[in-house]
UniProtKB/Swiss-Prot annotation:
Annotated Pfam families: FliE (PF02049)
Keyword annotations: Bacterial flagellum
Upper classification of the organism: Bacteria, Pseudomonadati, Aquificota, Aquificia, Aquificales
Protein name: Flagellar hook-basal body complex protein FliE
Coiled-coil regions listed: none
Length: 93
């Protein structure tokens, strides 16, 4: 197993000086796709074990945890976005 740098995580929410609405939406879509990839990779490893292929147990557990953490992060980001949206809707014009 190869151990790489910690910089492999995509820089999805970098702070930019001129942030446009489209960029935020595009970043969120990229983030959702990244989480989906983690979920699919975990699912493929689990299916490989069920098919009888030789897959190390630690790889399955690690990928399952990565998928779980990514999904939990996505849920928290969604909750914060909804909370911000609700606060904006409560503001009086």
């Amino acid at each position: 197993m190869e151990v790489g740098k910690l910089g492999f995580i995509p820089k999805l929410f970098e702070v930019q000086q001129n942030v446009k609405g489209e960029d935020i939406v595009e970043n969120f879509v990229n983030f959702v796709e990244w989480v989906n990839e983690k979920q699919l990779k975990s699912k493929k490893l689990k299916e490989a074990v069920l098919e009888g292929r030789d897959v190390p147990l630690h790889e399955i557990v690690i990928e399952a945890e990565k998928a779980k953490v990514a999904l939990n992060l996505l849920i928290e980001v969604r909750n914060k976005l909804l909370e911000a949206y609700n606060e904006l809707m409560k503001m009086q014009v």
